[in-house]
Design a protein with these regions (language model features):
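Short, hydrophobic beta-strand segments
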Residues: 2-8, 156-164, 215-223, 355-363, ...
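Glycine/proline-enriched, intrinsically flexible loops and inter-domain linkers
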Residues: 5, 23, 63, 184, ...
Length: 465
């Protein structure tokens, strides 16, 4: 998993260096594979605004732009061949003397006889994305003349960790923040997921035909969305630094919540759903997936279906037919708990390993689904407008995982650790890890593990480690 150090520090910010943070995380058993800067070395790139555009006198594919944002507030003349160059947009502007990634120096030059005092940049030229279709259009409120590194908060590091299968709870910013908070006895600020009131009555029915495989399914209808709105730059940057490509607001929001909270989600085009949602085992049926491949989904695979067809491979990948697009106005958000034993191995069998399957087969917090859908709803409405219906929760409580009750004996703990730790320190550490104290007597204590720690079920040996 890749994550942005600055994103993590928004939740927990101990007074330690990047090197010390990496060492701590590694010593805690979350092996760090790589640390790299969030942006390649560059200088002299600022936020520019195109003030005027004229056709180049001697080149059909070139235009002459007057650009604000240069030194001392003066406008600079730039010759540009990007098809989206137009008046009013804000773009990265490399002034004369700038250095771009790859040791590319920007100099004053003539292009087909017209003076050019710098360069307007796209994402690929700055090595900050893979969109090579033209200029990188920045948000309208980007302050002209501001250094791009400052504006995008690029003074950051991307840290990649390799987690053991039993620590799926750390596959999110929230989970990592908990660990760092424990290691440093630092306060952790968790993202609030306040309920978003329903403003319409629209909902879908949900039927759990395989409750042992899907014990909780949470859905929410949102209507009247404008999915042509751009994903906010801050969200795109957090996704990029996590190794996730921006694909439009609906998909970006679900990916963002996955990274932030650890709950995989999916967005369906509501108009493509026939009747209600049915969570069932497959019927050896064909399904075209979001990656344009077609698979035959076998009877041992859980699917999300409607009244007439399979819509998605549960916990792995959505189907193409119900995918959202720019013209989608109404969606159904899905946030579910799938049994890890049902998902495990399926992604590999179909050759479809995804961020969602990676988390579901390791175990997702069974109490997270409603909070995640509220968080996604708030973000979606903020970006694209619209109206949300009520949250629909269908569950089979008997099939949901139960938190383990664990008894620790002080003498046994000291024997296994090889050192005696004061009971107050043990209690503090366990509380920070999310455990709840049931009782303490003279010889030890009894605790209930948090819903996100599937690994705390093996008794004293596991907890002593």
């Amino acid at each position: 998993m890749k994550f942005s150090e600055s994103w993590l520090r928004q939740s927990v910010n101990p007074s330690i260096s990047t090197a010390d943070l990496v060492a701590q995380v590694t010593m805690a058993g979350l092996e760090v594979d790589a640390v790299e800067p969030a942006a390649p070395a560059m200088s002299g790139v600022v936020v520019g605004e195109i003030m005027s555009v004229e056709q180049h006198p001697d080149a059909d594919k070139l235009r002459v732009c007057q650009v604000a944002g240069g030194k001392e507030g003066e406008q600079a003349q730039i010759v540009c061949g990007a098809p989206n160059a137009r008046v009013g947009i804000k773009v990265p502007f490399a002034v004369v003397g700038a250095k771009l990634p790859g040791d590319f120096n920007i100099k004053q030059a003539k292009l087909r006889g017209v003076e050019s005092m710098g360069m307007l940049c796209g994402q690929t030229e700055l090595k900050l994305g893979d969109d090579d279709t033209g200029l990188w259009e920045l948000p309208a409120d980007a302050p002209v003349g501001t250094d791009l590194i400052t504006y995008l908060d690029l003074d950051d590091n991307i840290i990649e960790v390799d987690l053991t299968p039993n620590r799926g709870d750390c596959l999110s910013i929230r989970g990592l923040a908990r660990e760092v908070g424990v290691l440093n006895k630092a306060a952790v600020s968790e993202q609030a997921c306040a309920p978003v009131p329903a403003t319409i009555d629209d909902s879908v029915t949900v039927t759990l035909e395989a409750p042992n495989a899907c014990a909780r399914y949470v859905g929410r209808v949102i209507r009247g969305l404008d999915l042509t709105q751009p994903t906010p730059q801050w969200m795109q940057e957090k996704l990029r630094r996590s190794g996730v490509r921006s694909l439009g607001p609906a998909v970006d929001v679900t990916n963002y919540v996955l990274l932030e909270l650890g709950q995989p989600m999916h967005a369906f085009d509501l108009s493509k759903i026939d009747g209600g949602i049915v969570v069932r085992m497959a019927r050896d049926e064909k399904l075209k997936l979001l990656d344009d491949s077609e698979v035959t989904v076998t009877a041992d695979t859980l699917v999300i279906a409607d009244q007439s067809k399979a819509l998605a491979m549960a916990g792995i990948m959505g189907g193409d037919e119900s995918a959202v697009g720019d013209d989608t106005t109404d969606i159904l958000f899905e946030s579910a708990w799938f049994n890890p034993l049902v998902i495990a191995g399926k992604a590999r069998n179909y050759g479809k390993h995804t961020d969602s399957s990676h988390r579901f087969e390791r175990g997702v917090d069974a109490q997270l689904q409603v909070a995640a859908i509220e968080r996604a709803t708030a973000l979606m409405l903020e970006i694209c407008g619209g109206n949300a219906g009520p949250v629909v929760v269908e569950e089979s409580a008997e099939h949901l995982p139960q938190s383990a009750t664990i008894t620790l004996r002080d003498n046994r703990l000291a024997q296994q650790l090889g050192v005696s730790i004061p009971a107050a320190d043990v209690d503090d550490m366990l509380v920070r890890l999310g455990l709840s104290l049931v009782e303490r007597d003279n010889g030890g204590s009894t605790w209930v593990a948090p819903s996100w720690r599937f690994d705390l079920t093996l008794g004293l040996n596991q907890n002593a480690s």
